[in-house]
Amino acid sequence: MNLAYIPSPTFSKFEIGPFTIHMYAICILIGICVAVWILATRWKRYGGTFDQILDTTLVTVPCALVGARLYHCITTPADYFPPTGNLVNILKVWEGGMAIFGGISVGTLVAFLWCRHKHYPFAIFADAIAPALPVAQAIGRLGNWFNQELYGWPTTLPWGLKLNDADAIGKSEICYSGAQCPDYRTTLFHPTFLYEMIWNLIGAALIIYLGHKLADRLKAGQQFAMYLMWYGLGRTWIENVRINYSTVILGLRTNVWTAIIVFVLGCILFVVLYQYGPDPKAQARGLAAVTADELERQSIEEEQLRQKKQTNRTK
């Protein structure tokens, strides 16, 4: 008998009038809000404004969420594509299924294109968001706890996760290995959502600490490379603890391969930027100049609008 364990929530949604609110969505939204706050705080230190971050967020986040959903559906096709799945299930995001690797890939691409369009230095934008991303991911992982999903192998450790939903066993009662899972009522499972939360928060703290400690030595973009290395390394071992179904390629789960690629790309990016990366101070001066131009244009537009309104009143 297990005397100590982590209990699972007894609910994953609630009703407000005719609307159903899913805790999974709330966790993601809170994570996004906290990440935007961290990003904006760091961005303003480089000479930017909150409005710049707000505009970038409104463009990037929806695309990142679509990328996260599509990556999940593509890497677990049995539930979403014929002959075993239903395409309509792709739209059922409230049931869970958002893969961060897809979100990172699409979100990074869209953010790069937007920064290029607005003439913002992307390298320091990437550095500004580097610790914000793992914090957002840590908060979002609580959604997996509410959904009772993405847990790990059975364990007897005192921090094992106790499930209270029969359907929570991989949502199919079949373990990833193909064997029948133990009885959820008497078995504890590794809380991989918690492992990743802790890993991400440690990573965010390290990025902030090293970014401050090595401020005179780091090139612009290297803090983002740290994030890629840290998260790729963490997902490599955490993914191997999970028992949810995943496509296997050459003996490794798809997400393990992706995590390895992300880690390697982070290492390469860190080394390349160390040799050839831009100077953060020069990038900050460039951002300050762009910001000054934006504020001047806004001031001119506001003055023109004020004069136009005043003219209309006198007619």
From Swiss-Prot:
Coiled coil: none annotated. The keyword Kinase does not apply. Keywords: Cell membrane, Membrane, Transferase, Transmembrane, Transmembrane helix. GO terms for biological process: lipoprotein biosynthetic process. GO terms for cellular component: plasma membrane. Belongs to the Lgt family. This is Phosphatidylglycerol--prolipoprotein diacylglyceryl transferase. It comes from Bifidobacterium longum (strain NCC 2705).
